[in-house]
Amino acid sequence: MYKRQLPHLGEIPNLVVLRTFSKMYGLAGLRLGYGVMPEWLADLLLRVKLPFSVNILAEQAGLAALDDDIFVSQTLLVVSEGRRLLERELSAMGCKVWPSQANFLMFEPPMDARTLFEALLAKGVIIRPLGSYGMPEKLRVSIGNEEENLEFLAKTAEVLRDHDRHS
């Protein structure tokens, strides 16, 4: 667990910090997470927890992941570098990019967001349109490895160039 993100644990009596293994560890298919909380609250939650809610393989994978500090450090570095690259290049393409500390960015392209989403999807690049969240002109892109980020940027630049030529 990254301790710097839990500064108030123990100071605030009813604080619960939830973590998922989906993003940092790439274990989304296991549907696994954990909570850090005061012991009294953990005891209450254990009383109402479903039996066998996590299978033994998922549990073992989660425990192994928690011990892999090197992987966490490498992942944080890849995400940090990828975030900077995507922020810089999307901005250079005329997109408005919102600040982020997560493994994804929200941006508004200089063309219709839904059209860009569909064009990228046709090219095999999957991003998330944010219309269902009340932000129809914004998109969300997950930060991948360097190869994935460069592919996303190249195909986005291609779609934006084609749009400019036909406008």
Q: Residues of each region from the PLM?
A:
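Conserved small/polar residues in nucleotide/adenosyl-binding loops
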Residues: M1-Q5
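Short hydrophobic/aromatic beta-strand micro-patches
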Residues: V36, M106-E108, S142-G144
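PLP-dependent aminotransferase class I/II
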Residues: N14-S91, C95-W98
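PLP-dependent enzyme catalytic core of the Aspartate aminotransferase-like
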Residues: A119-K123, R128, S132-S167
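Short acidic/glycine-enriched loop/turn segments that link adjacent beta-strands
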Residues: G29, Q101-A102, G134-E137
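Conserved PLP-binding catalytic core of the aspartate aminotransferase-like
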Residues: V79-S80, R84, R88-K123, L139
